[in-house]
């Protein structure tokens, strides 16, 4: 979604970025900067949310490359999606999901945004004017010659075009396609076969207009069933995503304490199954390795491209680059899991945040620059910086549909 786009109900899109849409090669719309309004380092005053619009951890050059980026928002939607592998509040582009209802298709990202389409028959397509997005159901070898996507459709492998159980999304006749399928799984011993397909579709890959593919590999069985554990990009490189459970992280923390001769800190073996940011299975991404590169098969990195550290409550605490140097750190509220109260780039001052009882940011503290305070009234938000300069935003709408109609 782009800021300012209109929905089918007449309101503007408020959870999106200025140029990134669902279907863009760099990821799903960021969902953390409604209306494009941010303040400071940064805060979205319309939602009263601490946001980080996008930080890229992996981006190697090449056709249809695998780009691993993170976005954060402290905003809590009324219909939260499950907590992803980066912990509460954080999102990755691959967390897109299509729900199949009786008469409705709901395309959702991990931030709780939803885009509704009518039921599609095989070979039919739906178009969202607000997103400039097509959703097409497979089941035909060719689209009508006059269709804007006819040429792009032919770039798909025949098995994808002919499968009525797959859906494909794109925001441009130039591509790429986002492939929405299902995770193959190992059936239970007493399960009646063939097992029915799930009532949802998840992102399984991308295909560009030249037929190059990026594939997301999901586990078929075990404790990580359905989770992405590998990616093959358009250059043929393979990345391995190392996942951990809360119990595994707790055991690792105990072993580190023993080897270091220190008293083990409180690190529970399980996490609550639900947070303000949605259901939580406790599975987290620990590291990403490059395991195959056709251009340099004998010269693979001896360390992960990125590594993540976690708090005992399953919150993203630190990011380490390929040299094992910590580049980011995050601190969260003791009471509200996933609510960020501070963050820091290595070598820079720590930026801190305070919230009110409704979970809205009221103060942003920067020891080496401008600090900000936020005052929330009905249809009015006042932002004051540490030089006593003031900006007043007059708004309309509520919650995620709030938009600025006048500035002072």
Task: Place the predicted regions along the sequence by residue.
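Solvent-exposed loop and beta-edge segments used for protein-protein assembly and interaction
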Residues: 60-62, 99-101, 163
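Extended charged/polar low-complexity repeat regions
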Residues: 88, 103-408
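N-terminal targeting and processing segments
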Residues: 70-71, 91-95, 127
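Residue-level recognition of conserved structural "scaffold" positions that shape functional pockets
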Residues: 17, 42, 55, 61, ...
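Short alpha-helical segments and helix-capping/turn motifs at coil-helix boundaries
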Residues: 50-55, 91-93, 99-103
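Short, polar loop/linker segments at the starts of domains and inter-domain junctions
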Residues: 77-91
